[in-house]
Amino acid sequence: EFCDFSGNQAAGGVMVMDTSSPELRQSSSGSDVLNATSSTSSHQVSGDVAGYLNVPSPESNGSNHEGSRESANDNKGLGDARVLNCHSPESQGSGNYGSNVSEGLNYPSDSNKSVHSSPNFENNSIKNGAVEEKIKLEGVNANISKCSSLLKRKKSSEDSNNINIHQKLTNVALSDNVNNDEDEKKRARLVRNRESAQLSRQRKKHYVEELEDKVRIMHSTIQDLNAKVAYIIAENATLKTQ
């Protein structure tokens, strides 16, 4: 009732305290906080409140912030205009009312914005982290698949090389076996030819020896026959002479 907050709240929400009543002056003199006249105190309180709320006051009418700062610095006896430390019940009621009004003027600050935006930021960061983890997992899976494919290719190439080497070895072994068989056959043929040659030679020798024996027998028979012929011729001659 003793403090009238004047000001156009729709225009800027500025609170101006009218301290022209004598009761408020007495309470301010008793509390040693407000030591100025009603006109100067109203302008100073409005300037301090406007500086605290960072809202231009209607009394300034577009004046520079430096003027308001100088006026606030000149009036050091007012104390801190943000909180009215009045010991009287009237001033305490007015201070509570002013604090309630100032608390009612809820201007969105950067901290509130950051508080409201922090869950979204955390959600976005969590989503980004999950996406990055998924991308990393996909990259790891791709690398694992590549490594597995390379290992499979290496294993298949090694298996094919081993198969080729085994086939070559088997072919060499077969060729060696074939060559060995051919060599054995050739050796067997040579042995047979040698044996047959020896047998043929022996047969020839036996045959020649038999022929020589027969020739000798024929010569002996011829000589015997010649002797008999000569004897017969001699007997014929003797018979003719008789």
Curated annotation (Swiss-Prot):
<protein>
    <recommendedName>
        <fullName>TGACG-sequence-specific DNA-binding protein TGA-1B</fullName>
    </recommendedName>
</protein>
<comment type="similarity">
    <text>Belongs to the bZIP family.</text>
</comment>
<dbReference type="InterPro" id="IPR046347">
    <property type="entry name" value="bZIP_sf"/>
</dbReference>
<feature type="region of interest" description="Disordered">
    <location>
        <begin position="1"/>
        <end position="125"/>
    </location>
</feature>
<keyword id="KW-0539">Nucleus</keyword>
<feature type="compositionally biased region" description="Polar residues">
    <location>
        <begin position="18"/>
        <end position="45"/>
    </location>
</feature>
<keyword id="KW-0238">DNA-binding</keyword>
<dbReference type="GO" id="GO:0005634">
    <property type="term" value="C:nucleus"/>
</dbReference>
<dbReference type="GO" id="GO:0003700">
    <property type="term" value="F:DNA-binding transcription factor activity"/>
</dbReference>
<dbReference type="GO" id="GO:0003677">
    <property type="term" value="F:DNA binding"/>
</dbReference>
<feature type="region of interest" description="Basic motif">
    <location>
        <begin position="185"/>
        <end position="216"/>
    </location>
</feature>
<feature type="region of interest" description="Leucine-zipper">
    <location>
        <begin position="225"/>
        <end position="239"/>
    </location>
</feature>
<dbReference type="InterPro" id="IPR004827">
    <property type="entry name" value="bZIP"/>
</dbReference>
<dbReference type="Pfam" id="PF00170">
    <property type="entry name" value="bZIP_1"/>
</dbReference>
<comment type="function">
    <text>Binds specifically to the DNA sequence 5'-TGACG-3'.</text>
</comment>
<feature type="compositionally biased region" description="Basic and acidic residues">
    <location>
        <begin position="66"/>
        <end position="79"/>
    </location>
</feature>
<feature type="compositionally biased region" description="Polar residues">
    <location>
        <begin position="88"/>
        <end position="125"/>
    </location>
</feature>
<feature type="domain" description="bZIP">
    <location>
        <begin position="183"/>
        <end position="242"/>
    </location>
</feature>
